Amino acid sequence: MSEMTPREIVSELDQHIIGQADAKRAVAIALRNRWRRMQLQEPLRHEVTPKNILMIGPTGVGKTEIARRLAKLANAPFIKVEATKFTEVGYVGKEVDSIIRDLTDSAMKLVRQTEIEKNRFRAEEAAEDRILDALLPPAKNQWGQVETTDSNNTTRQVFRKKLREGQLDDKEIDIDVAAPSMGVEIMAPPGMEEMTNQLQSMFQNLSSGQTKKRKMKIKDALKTLIDDEAAKLINPEDLKQKAIDAVEQNGIVFIDEIDKICKKGEYSGADVSREGVQRDLLPLVEGTTVSTKHGMVKTDHILFIASGAFQVARPSDLIPELQGRLPIRVELSALSAVDFERILTEPNASLTEQYKALMATEGVNIEFTGESIKKIAEAAFRVNEKTENIGARRLHTVMERLMDKISFNASDMQGQVVRIDEAYVMDALGDVVENEDLSRFIL
């Protein structure tokens, strides 16, 4: 669980997302409140429920990116889902309970990785011993018992030192590794997901404990054996309980495109399913118990963050009960030409840095002038105004158009320096930006 302060969280998000200060603050406070709640004593801790968030803003302004970056910062079970993928009970499609099942699976991976890291030192020693046994099979007496001598120990220590220094990395050895579990995909009708999970677990258990001899380089064998040995040191039941606790206390669910399941007054028929999805979401958001293959999971303290463009529907089109369970509303503003300019240069791994690095692999040095950045930003902004406003995603289209000629010829331009200035941008984009018909089809 992250112990970062709200200011630190916002500062970290600022490195990747331009603007949208209100949304960053709301998310940062919500994440910090998870930590604050865990510091409380039990009777009060149970009463403090998370304040769920509804992010409202046009497409391409950073809603989903905030969720992606939050997942990395949270160090907690996190899942992002599309509201449109779900249907109400009785319709063909995924049920909303699968959100919690997927979140629990995510928590299992997170907790397993944490436990493996805790046991890594012991696992490394055991893995080294197995590799040394393969390199130097221990001598046995006439009764088949392993004999240890000073010379054997000395040789073993010499090889252990070489192994740790990487001198044996490219040598190949035969080792016994755990056989991969049987991957059985079972299609099930709605409402039968739990039964299919149990069947899949049964098939996986059939192959568990089996080993397979493989020929591998020592470098790769060491990684495989460390994971294998670490898995032996982990108690599966403890792992399940820790994963369930992590989901119940620190889990975060990000529901994107929630505006697409709003009921619109002028439609009927299929919209019944849309409202049904909202009603199915209610128990999850309010607090219920969901059965998963790892155990029963309570959703009372899971944080839900919903987002939507709400260009056709409005937040008030959500059913009142769901509106009441998303008390914090945050509006994200549309991006300006100045924002586009900052997006091109300020974030870590900005678009311009990405293209420079890609072309550098071919030995081509790309230079962007300040004026060219400004013109690219203006071009993207103008196309958004003339056609559909898709926010910062327009920059990807514009940059691909701008870099098209260089990307195609880069392999023949090794050692050259290409300076992208205002004239270059106008030459590449000018006609397309000015002609609205071309903009619609090309940009």
From Swiss-Prot:
SMART domains: AAA (SM00382), ClpB_D2-small (SM01086). ATP binds at I18, G60, V61, G62, K63, T64, E65, D256, E321, R393. It comes from the Bacteria. Coiled coil: none annotated. It is found in: Cytoplasm. GO terms for biological process: protein unfolding; proteolysis involved in protein catabolic process. One of its GO terms (molecular function) is ATP binding. A double ring-shaped homohexamer of HslV is capped on each side by a ring-shaped HslU homohexamer. The assembly of the HslU/HslV complex is dependent on binding of ATP. ATPase subunit of a proteasome-like degradation complex; this subunit has chaperone activity. The binding of ATP and its subsequent hydrolysis by HslU are essential for unfolding of protein substrates subsequently hydrolyzed by HslV. HslU recognizes the N-terminal part of its protein substrates and unfolds these before they are guided to HslV for hydrolysis. This is ATP-dependent protease ATPase subunit HslU. It comes from Pasteurella multocida (strain Pm70). The gene is hslU.
